[in-house]
From Swiss-Prot:
Annotated protein name in UniProt: Antimicrobial peptide D1
Domain of life assignment: Eukaryota
Source species: Stellaria media
InterPro entries on file: Defensin_plant, Scorpion_toxin-like, Scorpion_toxin-like_sf
Similarity-based family: Belongs to the DEFL family.
N-terminal signal peptide: 1-31
Disulfide bridge map: 34-81, 45-66, 51-75, 55-77
Gene3D superfamilies found in the cross-reference section: Knottin, scorpion toxin-like
PANTHER family the record matches: DEFENSIN-LIKE PROTEIN 1, DEFENSIN-LIKE PROTEIN 19
Length: 81
């Protein structure tokens, strides 16, 4: 009887440890992405590819895209926060 109880405790602790370990591995925090209007773009933004290239090359952003913000389309750059 004592061996059975000990075996149950060992099995339970092993499963608990595995669940806690897998829970920590499965959780990966997502980095936040910050958006701000391009400081180097002039005029209306029509082509997102051009905006993306300018944000990446000139402003060291991860990416860029055209979005509407009153009163026109603007180039927005995306950075890791």
């Amino acid at each position: 009887m004592a061996k059975t109880v000990l075996g149950i405790h060992v099995t339970f602790l092993t499963l608990l440890f595995a669940v806690l370990l897998l829970n920590d591995v499965m959780y990966t925090p997502v980095e936040k992405i910050c958006e701000r209007a391009s400081g180097t773009w002039k005029g209306i933004c029509i082509h997102s590819n051009d905006c993306n290239n300018q944000c990446v090359k000139w402003e060291n952003a991860g990416s860029g895209s055209c979005h509407y913000q009153f009163p026109n389309y603007m180039c927005f750059c995306y950075f890791d926060c």
